[in-house]
């Protein structure tokens, strides 16, 4: 009887140990599966060095925190060398973080055009993305100019200025919940050959009368946030993106966050 009871106890211990091991393996596999399957994946083409580095560094820190909180993954690249159809197929959102629309490889250009025109993913561009013209020995990219409303860069405010931005379409998901107007400080407001309004859906514009200090660098009707609905991809251009303190601006941070989830088709439950 004692031996039988002893054997039963040993068998019970073994069963318990195997059960604990099985549970542990299930938990481990579940954790690994979650790590391998983020909610969605973002690629960030970020300009490095020069005057834009502080903003890009702040954006990277902010993005990493947002990604951790919302279970999406971010991959950073600093050149267009990796960009092709296969690379972009792994990303539901492309963020052009102050990277200009020139110095792209031909393969990257062609893949990006397909990505946007066929709606393979979403796009958010900041600031330098409308530096359209002939720069650093590169010709203007005509397709990208059309994508941005047919504009060409003409001038900017080198000494920076504060300005009040008015939300024109508060019902759009990208600007939902943003107080209007809101102040943007220390920005080097660009001017373009003309307003893109006729070719895009304007979400917000800057009131040039509110520039402080005042300046002669103006263009009249001055959109600063817009989307081009002629393309299948959900896309947002946000002009602001020079000063790192923008991430302390609730309006800017909200627009960036909203735009990510909207452009990546995740806005149903951000």
Q: Where on the chain are the PLM-derived regions?
A:
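A glycine-rich, often tryptophan-bearing local segment used as a flexible ligand/cofactor-contacting loop or short
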Residues: 102-177
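Active-site rim elements
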Residues: 50, 160-162, 179, 242-249
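Bacterial N-terminal signal peptides
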Residues: 14-27
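Catalytic beta-strand/loop cores that center a nucleophilic Ser/Cys/Thr
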Residues: 150-232
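N-terminal secretory signal peptides that target proteins for export/translocation
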Residues: 1-11
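Extracellular ligand-binding/catalytic regions of CAZymes and related secreted enzymes
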Residues: 35-40, 46, 54-57, 62-69, ...
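Helical hinge/lid and interdomain linker segments adjacent to catalytic or ligand-binding clefts
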Residues: 36, 41-132
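Sec/Tat signal peptide C-region and signal peptidase I cleavage site
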Residues: 29-33
């Amino acid at each position: 009887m004692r031996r039988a009871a002893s054997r039963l106890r040993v068998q019970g211990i073994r069963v318990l140990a195997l059960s604990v091991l099985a549970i542990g393996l299930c938990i481990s596999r579940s954790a690994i599966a979650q790590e391998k399957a983020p909610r969605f994946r973002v690629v960030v083409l970020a300009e490095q060095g020069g005057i834009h580095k502080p903003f890009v560094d702040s954006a990277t820190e902010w993005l990493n925190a947002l990604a951790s909180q919302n279970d999406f993954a971010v991959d950073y690249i600093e050149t267009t060398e990796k960009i092709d159809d296969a690379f972009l197929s792994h990303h539901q959102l492309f963020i052009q973080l102050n990277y200009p629309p020139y110095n792209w490889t031909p393969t990257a250009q062609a893949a990006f055009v397909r990505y946007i025109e066929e709606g393979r993913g979403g796009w958010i561009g900041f600031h330098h993305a409308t530096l359209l013209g002939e720069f650093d020995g590169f010709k203007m990219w005509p397709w990208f100019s059309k994508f941005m409303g047919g504009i060409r860069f003409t001038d900017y405010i080198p000494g920076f200025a504060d300005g009040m931005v008015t939300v024109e379409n508060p019902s759009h998901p990208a600007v939902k919940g943003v107080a209007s107007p809101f102040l943007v400080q220390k920005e080097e407001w660009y001017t373009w050959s003309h307003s893109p309004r006729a070719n895009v859906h304007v979400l917000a514009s800057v009131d040039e009368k509110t520039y402080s200090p005042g300046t002669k660098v103006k263009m009249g009707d001055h959109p600063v946030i817009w989307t081009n609905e002629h393309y299948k991809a959900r896309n947002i251009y946000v002009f602001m993106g020079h000063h790192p303190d923008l991430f302390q601006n609730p309006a800017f941070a909200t627009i960036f966050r909203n735009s990510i989830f909207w452009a990546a088709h995740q806005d149903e439950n951000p």
